[in-house]
Amino acid sequence: MFHITAIDLYGNAFYTETIALPYSNTEEYYRQLTDKVRKFIAENHYPNEKILGISIATQGITSPDNSTVIYGNIMNNTGMKLEDFSRHLPYPCHLEHDSKSAAFLELWNHPELDSAVVFLLNRNLGGAIITNHQIHQGSSMHSGTLEHMCVNPDGPLCYCGNHGCLETYCSANALEQSAGMPVKEFFPLLREKKSPRLAEHWEDYLNHLAFAMKNLNLIIDAPIIISGYLAPYFTEEDINYLLEHHQHRRTIHPGQKPDSGRHPRARIHLPLVQLYIM
């Protein structure tokens, strides 16, 4: 599955489409995907000369020059190249790690933001570090991969091969596995406050999240931003619980919300947009 979104130079999304096409590291996949992109452009009547470029966000750490995925265990896309897409498209193309794109969206929406730790609470956990109003990449592009912080050496096996990573406790997939039901069913039942079992699962989730936040803030003294799929489900009570266990007041902020006027998927294009407005 992949999403296509068209945005302007202000970061506003005009059209978006979701297409069911499972990833496969084959020429046929890249051709089908780029054909869908061309069709999207044609159906929305975008003149070629008005299209400044195409940005591709993927689960996977990219090389420093953003030309190749150097670590992609979730999608099994290690080795995927920007060229796999760009050779089929007559536009400038840009490849980006999806977690870094999410952090860029926070910078775009909050130009006053100097530093932050971003938690991307999606199906798979992600994260990013913002320092000096820039996304910190690290020497090997691994900076901000908080999902692989070990919170329990004897914990569940993570897809990275290690045990007890934060991914195995605080991703949406981990929450569904522990609760035994989809997220969309879990939260309405949780808020009814009639199930001690569900409350226990959620408390365990929040405890692990607060533990990670506290430790990260010992290294990066900056606000915490909660974003991603699970973020809209957090209540004020949940935030206060995190603050109490985090032991640093006024440091947790909600990230981009779906009703904020800018489509969250617009984040994938913002690094490319910046190239044209600077």
Segments the model singles out, each with a brief description of its role:
Residues 5-7, 128:
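Conserved hydrophobic/aromatic positions in well-ordered beta-strands
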Residues 28-47, 168-169, 174-236, 254-262:
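Adenine-nucleotide phosphate-binding core of ATP-dependent small-molecule kinases
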Residues 16-18, 25-26, 83, 90-196:
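Glycine/GP-enriched mid-protein hinge/lid loop-to-helix segment characteristic of carbohydrate kinases
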Residues 13, 68-69, 135-136:
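Hydrophobic "anchor" residues
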Residues 16-42, 49-115, 236-247:
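Glycine-rich phosphate-binding loop and adjoining helix at the ATP-binding site
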Residues 234-237, 241-258, 262-278:
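Acidic/histidine-enriched, beta-strand-rich ligand/metal-binding domains
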